[in-house]
Amino acid sequence: GMDVQKQEIREAVELPLTHFDLYRQIGIDPPRGVLLYGPPGTGKTMLAKAVAHHTTAAFIRVVGSEFVQKYLGEGPRMVRDVFRLAKENAPAIIFIDEVDSIATARFDAHTGADREVQRILMELLNQMDGFDQTVNVKVIMATNRADTLDPALLRPGRLDRKIECPAPDRRQKRLVFQVCTAKMNLSDEVDLEDYVSRPDKISAADIRAICQEAGLQAVRKNRYVVMPKDFEKGYKSSVRKPGDEFSFY
């Protein structure tokens, strides 16, 4: 699945690292950065890892919250260190997951913690501006909340390509079910197409949870075969209906 997303991230990250001369001959600059956004569990992190696997580039993965440190100035210094490390080991890919934790739209900060987070964002903007296109370093960022990001980060020249990772369609759900159940011992009565055709909006992570829960139901009953009733229980326990709400005590 995700054929369009794979093609777009390949053009933005993989091809500039492996065939940079192609862009030079055409007379264009490859995208500097890529933003992956979409609901949780739709494969944003796995897509970035797949790109790193298909290139010989060094892969540096950082979670946005890791930049937020106890002492003043530590966060911006870590941002500089990450980009310096990438340049020293070029070609390299910097993957910043959950970037919304440090790159939300700026506002009048009233606390020291908020001001420090904004300094981290300023350093991130500065580092992405100072990129030399001849240095093969690409930046991939992922978030569930693209609507909260600072406009200065989203402008062309920093994050040139925005790739949406939506919930899987029917064909993609079928493929994910096939992958998740490939090693499972399923009964002949299990009809995966029934779960694929259901209208509930589920992510790839939900599908994996359904299959895991179905397997656990079989283990609980001390069976070696997963039955249709196991999948039904797994589906009901893993998929939330639109009206469902968690109870808070």
Segments and roles (model prediction):
Residues 1-198, 202, 214:
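Walker A/P-loop NTP-binding motif of AAA+ ATPase domains
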